[in-house]
Amino acid sequence: MGAFTEKQEALVNSSWEAFKGNIPQYSVVFYTSILEKAPAAKNLFSFLANGVDPTNPKLTAHAESLFGLVRDSAAQLRANGAVVADAALGSIHSQKALNDSQFLVVKEALLKTLKEAVGDKWTDELSTALELAYDEFAAGIKKAYA
């Protein structure tokens, strides 16, 4: 991977700002997308026990945290060329025995959600920047529990 550019970081930041514009709505888009592709994922998130509820503060907090961590990963990539995930994240994901296909489902849901959030500002360049940031974030989590 080449260096993560200032423009790529700015693109990721702009998608984060769009997401923050309506966290409850975009949290629903995100988790609905996950459950459509992987219904069993419902068992991985305690706050999905009763379905996707936009008024559930745990649902919106988790989505906000994840999307924020992807944004932070873009900043780490720009500053350091690598992402270092928190060991606690590695531990949690290790306990749930997550595999690559599950990380892919989350990535696809994240992209779908942010595409909706940014609307006509969506570009291939934005998609690539988000994919790089997410992939490096996921790799950091996996490394933390390897």
From Swiss-Prot:
Query: Is DNA-binding among this UniProt entry's keywords?
Result: no
Protein name (Swiss-Prot/TrEMBL) = Leghemoglobin
User: Where are residues bearing Phosphoserine located in the sequence?
Assistant: 46
Superkingdom, taxonomy of origin: Eukaryota
Residues the record lists as Nitrated tyrosine modifications: 26, 31, 134
Write out the similarity annotation: Belongs to the plant globin family.
The positions annotated for binding O2 are: 62
Report a single Gene Ontology molecular function: oxygen carrier activity
Query: Which post-translational modifications are recorded for this protein?
Result: Nitrated mainly at Tyr-31 and, to a lower extent, at Tyr-26 and Tyr-134, in effective nodules and particularly in hypoxic conditions; this mechanism may play a protective role in the symbiosis by buffering toxic peroxynitrite NO(2)(-). Nitration level decrease during nodule senescence. Phosphorylation at Ser-46 disrupts the molecular environment of its porphyrin ring oxygen binding pocket, thus leading to a reduced oxygen consumption and to the delivery of oxygen O(2) to symbiosomes.
**Quaternary data:** Monomer.
**Swiss-Prot/TrEMBL GO biological process terms:** nodulation
UniProt main location, coarse: cytoplasm
Expression across tissues is: Root nodules.
Q: Which Pfam families match?
A: Globin (PF00042)
Binding positions for heme b?
A: 46, 93, 96
What keyword terms does UniProt attach to this protein? Answer: Cytoplasm, Heme, Iron, Metal-binding, Nitration, Nitrogen fixation, Nodulation, Nucleus, Oxygen transport, Phosphoprotein, Transport
Q: What organism, scientifically named, is this protein from? A: Phaseolus vulgaris (Kidney bean)
